[in-house]
A protein has these predicted regions:
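Positively charged n-region of N-terminal signal peptides that target proteins for export
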Residues: 1-4
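Sec-dependent N-terminal signal peptides
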Residues: 6-8, 56
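Short non-domain terminal segments
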Residues: 9-10, 418
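N-terminal signal peptide c-region/cleavage motif recognized by signal peptidases
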Residues: 13-15
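Acidic, polar-rich low-complexity tracts and alpha-helical solenoid repeat scaffolds
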Residues: 18-561
């Protein structure tokens, strides 16, 4: 008995091994385009195991490659007879008709197949996927569309949206999106995500806007289309239109200006300062009793500051008006947690735009003592205070401020900025070895700007030291930069004018031209500054400041000239 069992097992193993070998060989023939050899093996294998979907599909594909229409049809019909519920096989039969250019026959067959299989949700899904498997996207869409007619739009909206998207059928997708959110508002987030992808960067979004407006008019009681219209305006970056829309929604829903405030903040992020200002002023206009009154005042101040200082030529009158606005805010609310951000802006204005460094120092020293402020905000105040001290010539206190931030935020961008400022201060003082040692650390800083600045300053030191034993030329140049930082134009210009005569063979020529351009720009002599920047990138195109000079020249040309 054992012998018979062993023989049977051995025979079974041999048969399986032979079949496995034949499968591999058939697949290899098929991949190599040797279809006739593959066909013989697949025919044999399929007879042995007609339930194998893998063998069936490979055999069918081989017959199609050999243009064996009758055999292909017989094979599929056999599969349908053995597995009548398997819709993949039924789609395959129509696919065979198409493959052999029997289009009318295929169309009649597919129309009948779809008509008979759209009553159940799972049936629709399987049939549509069967069409997609054979790259028959239009038929998959037809299946979903017929399913929608039978079972409602919500049953297949996700699949149909995806099919329209994959076939670039933007108009039908948009119309479907309207129907879906009208039928079920809970689909809004999903549908808007799809629309954002389809209408990326506002491309061809006029149709979307038109349809949204139409549905909003047809369904005035359904606020969801007003919400969608707001999304459309934002996607198109039409912030003025978005503000009008959000004002309407805010009023309708008694949001107390909250949504307008949020949109104004978004406008600031996108540098749409005029629209942001209008939004903040609207919320302020609601009155002091509204909860968003103070935040909107702070937002307005921040927007006005960013708008005013964005230009390389800030308007002095606008600076003065903004200073007055901030002072009024602080007078009404005091120096506290709520007004600290606006006071920080006031300090920046006084230090950098109003030639009143002392006032800026007093403000910052007051902010730092204010309770409940976040440590990161206090650190930002200390960095600005360090700059202000430095402008006053108070080097020791500047180092102290930078050092405190560096120590507290060692691995953070704030700490790296503080370390860079301290390295720059050492550079101003002529301590190039120490400055370069700190800059080398910062070359791998997480913040790209700090890393780039560190690399640039380190290269400046490296390229212009070691040429003489005293490094006097570089020290004088660094001192000139320091004087410019302090707005001491006379001292800076005096050094720059003498440097080429004192050190005629030095490599600082491009740096001198560049710093002279910065002096002229700071004085408002933009034409002269532009000439000097142009000289830098034309004469010294290979040097480290050429890109900076080109950038400054472009900014002056765009904003002033």
């Amino acid at each position: 008995m054992r012998t018979i069992t062993s023989i049977c097992l051995l025979f079974f193993c041999l048969v399986n091994y032979a079949q496995s070998t034949d499968e591999k060989l058939a697949a290899q023939f098929y991949e190599n385009g040797e279809y006739e050899k593959a066909e013989g093996l697949y025919k044999k294998l399929y007879k042995q195991n007609s339930n194998s979907i893998y063998l069936y599909e490979n055999y069918l594909n081989t017959l199609l490659a050999l243009k064996e229409q009758k055999d292909a049809e017989k094979l599929v019909e056999k599969q349908i007879k053995e597995n009548p519920s398997r819709l993949n096989n039924q789609v395959d039969l129509g696919y065979v008709y198409l493959h052999f250019d029997e289009n009318e026959k295929a169309n009649r067959y597919f129309d009948k197949l779809i008509k008979e299989n759209v009553s159940g949700r799972n049936t629709v899904l399987i049939l549509a996927q069967s069409f997609e498997r054979r790259m028959l996207s239009d038929r998959a869409i037809q299946t979903y569309e017929q399913g929608v007619k039978k079972q409602g739009v919500i049953a297949f909206y996700a699949q149909l949206l995806a099919s329209y998207r994959n076939t670039n059928n933007t108009k039908d997708l948009t119309d479907l999106a309207m129907e879906v959110i009208q039928a079920d508002g809970s689909t809004f987030d999903y549908v808007t995500r799809v629309l954002d992808i389809v209408y990326e960067d506002g491309v061809a979004s006029t149709y979307l806007q038109q349809r949204t407006l139409l549905y909003a008019q047809k369904h005035p009681s359904n606020q969801i289309f007003d919400e969608l219209l707001l999304e459309v305006f934002l996607q198109q970056k039409k912030y003025t239109a978005a503000l009008r829309q959000v004002k309407s929604l805010d009023k309708r829903n008694n949001n107390n200006g909250q949504r307008v405030l949020q949109l104004a903040s978004l406008c600031v992020q996108n540098e749409e300062y005029n629209t942001a200002i209008e939004g903040y002023e609207y919320v302020i206009g609601l009155g002091k009793s509204y909860p968003n009154f103070l935040p909107s005042q702070q937002g307005l101040i921040n927007s006005l500051y960013l708008k005013t200082t964005k230009s390389i030529k800030p308007n002095k009158e606008e600076v003065g008006v903004l200073i007055d606005k901030i002072n009024l805010l602080v007078d009404a609310n005091g120096t506290n947690y709520n007004t600290a951000a606006s006071l920080y802006r006031l300090a920046e204005l006084q230090v950098f735009y109003n030639d009143n460094v002392g006032a800026g120092v007093n403000i910052l020293e007051s902010i730092i003592k204010t309770p409940r402020l976040q440590s990161t905000f206090i650190a930002e105040c200390k960095l600005l205070l360090g700059d202000a001290y430095l402008m006053q010539g108070n080097v020791w206190d500047a180092k102290l401020m930078y050092g405190q931030v560096d120590k507290q935020f060692k691995e953070d961008a704030l700490g790296q900025e503080a370390k860079f400022k301290n390295a720059k201060l050492s550079y101003y003082e002529g301590d190039f070895d120490w400055a370069k040692s700190q800059l080398d650390i910062l070359k791998t800083a997480t913040t790209q700007l700090i890393s780039n600045n560190a690399i640039e300053l380190a290269l400046l030191i490296q390229d212009n030291t070691g040429l003489d034993t005293t490094e006097d030329a570089m020290k004088e140049y660094a001192a000139a930069e320091f004087y410019l930082f302090q707005n001491n134009i006379a001292k800076c210009s005096e050094i720059l004018n003498l440097l080429p005569f004192k050190y005629p063979n030095h490599t600082l020529n491009d740096e001198i031209f560049y710093l002279k351009a910065r002096v002229q720009e700071k004085q408002g002599n933009y034409e002269e500054a532009n000439k000097l920047y142009t000289a830098v990138y034309e004469k010294y195109g290979e040097d480290i400041l050429a890109d900076n000079a080109l950038y400054r020249s472009a900014i002056i040309t765009l904003q002033v000239l």
